[in-house]
């Protein structure tokens, strides 16, 4: 029975000693040197909850992002309107004289003479076989019979005019050329009885047949050269030989 009280007293003594040692140690941390050792630190606890948001700070300066890579070139846009003409530039310096070919060289002269000789031969052949030449006129026929309007058109096509004798020599040349009665470039279509050439000029030479012009049938406004070389008025709608004159 005496053992139990003894143990109780022992435990109470140990608790009291431990408390006393703790207080003494805490006080010793304030007054004792650092060599006095206290109890070891405890284990870190769990993190606490997030605190409340603080007040909004001042606006910061604009930031600068990193410069990206250069992209590929874009498509060409539509062409713009033409700009205004610029002012004339300064006058250039005078150039060196050029070299002109010698137009009067012996070669050019010889070629020109050869061409003139050949043209003269051709005219002689044409005169001998197809036409007649008097002075600076060449009379030519194609041997076809047609109305006066068609004769005019034919001659104009070849840059000629309907044969119109201005004197006895030309009248005779046409007479010797034809084998049929031929139209001449003479009419009184504008004014009855007043015969003129196709340019409207009055005639200075005539060779009318006896009793002509008589305007038989009231529609004889054109003139024929007969086989005997005389003239006779006939209707322009009749068909006769075409003779043209070419200036040479």
From Swiss-Prot:
Leader sequence segment: 1-20
CDD domains the UniProt entry points to: CLECT_collectin_like (cd03591)
Subcellular location: Secreted
Region (Disordered) location: 43-110
Task of the protein: Calcium-dependent lectin involved in innate immune defense. Binds mannose, fucose and N-acetylglucosamine on different microorganisms and activates the lectin complement pathway. Binds to late apoptotic cells, as well as to apoptotic blebs and to necrotic cells, but not to early apoptotic cells, facilitating their uptake by macrophages.
Record remark on domains: The coiled-coil domain mediates trimerization.
Protein name in UniProt: Mannose-binding protein C
Source organism of this protein record: Nomascus concolor (Black crested gibbon)
């Amino acid at each position: 029975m005496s053992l139990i009280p003894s143990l109780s007293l022992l435990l109470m003594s140990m608790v009291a000693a431990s408390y006393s040692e703790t207080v003494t140690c805490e006080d010793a941390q304030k007054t004792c040197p650092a060599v006095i050792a206290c109890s070891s630190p405890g284990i870190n606890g769990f993190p606490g909850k997030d605190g409340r948001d603080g007040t909004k700070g001042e606006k910061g300066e604009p930031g600068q992002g990193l410069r990206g890579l250069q992209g590929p070139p874009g498509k060409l846009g539509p062409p713009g309107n033409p700009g205004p003409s610029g002012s004339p530039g300064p006058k250039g310096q005078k150039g060196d004289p050029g070299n002109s070919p010698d137009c009067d060289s012996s070669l050019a002269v010889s070629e020109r003479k050869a061409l003139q000789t050949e043209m003269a031969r051709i005219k002689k052949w044409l005169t001998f076989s197809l036409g007649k030449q008097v002075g600076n006129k060449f009379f030519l026929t194609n041997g076809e019979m047609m109305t006066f309007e068609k004769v005019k058109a034919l001659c104009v096509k070849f840059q000629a005019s309907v044969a119109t004798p201005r004197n006895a020599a030309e009248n005779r040349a046409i007479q010797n050329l034809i084998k049929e009665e031929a139209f001449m470039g003479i009419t009184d279509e504008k004014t009855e009885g007043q015969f003129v050439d196709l340019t409207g000029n009055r005639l200075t030479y005539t060779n009318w047949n006896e009793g002509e012009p008589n305007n038989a049938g009231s529609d004889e406004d054109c003139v024929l050269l007969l086989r005997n070389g005389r003239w006779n008025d006939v209707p322009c709608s009749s068909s006769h030989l075409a003779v043209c004159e070419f200036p040479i």
